[in-house]
Design a protein with these regions (language model features):
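Extended catalytic cores of very large enzyme megasubunits
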Residues: 1-169
Length: 169
């Protein structure tokens, strides 16, 4: 379902019609299993901010802000909705998808190929050590963050391109 607005793709390859159903599914997924929240409220809060030519990244940022604006004493669980929306945006930006996250070795290789990490990292750690570190990673725990907690991790601890604003890990 579309309302006639065009959206610029995150990858920069053209435009498509604003797909409200796709947006709704993402917000529903962010609200899934959380008591006292409503996907409709997040969507209503964000709806008036869309314009022709908006990017998918801007839509994601509007949805995150809309959910975070709903956090108050009576509705504290919107902090988890906003966190999930931020997490979805991070994963999409980093890996191009929200699920099927890469093995740690693949991610390190990607970062060394882009000169984010020093290639010397592979002389410091063996494949077995990287595999062992990967075995400790449980991406489902990412969903335990509150919005404030995840925002702090992103702003303070993730490797970022300070000039372009991109996040590398």
């Amino acid at each position: 379902m579309s309302n006639g607005l065009k959206v610029k793709k995150r990858n920069g390859r053209g435009t498509e019609s604003l797909n409200l159903e796709k947006m709704h599914k993402m917000v529903e997924e962010a609200c899934k299993g959380i008591a006292g929240v409503s996907a409709s409220q997040v969507e209503i809060q964000s709806g008036i901010q869309f314009y022709d030519g908006i990017t998918t990244q801007e839509i994601q940022e509007i949805l995150i802000k809309s959910a975070s604006d709903l956090i108050d004493l009576d509705h504290p669980n919107y902090q988890f909705v906003a966190a999930r929306l931020l997490l979805f945006a991070l994963r999409k930006s980093l890996y191009g998808k929200m699920r099927e996250l890469p093995h740690l070795e693949s991610h390190i290789m990607s970062c060394t190929n882009r000169d984010v990490y020093d290639k010397d990292i592979f002389t410091k750690y063996s494949k077995e050590e990287i595999d062992k570190a990967n075995s400790y990673i449980d991406h489902e725990r990412d969903f335990l963050f509150t919005y404030a907690g995840l925002r702090q991790v992103v702003d303070k601890y993730l490797v970022q391109d300070r000039s372009g604003g991109g996040v590398y890990e």
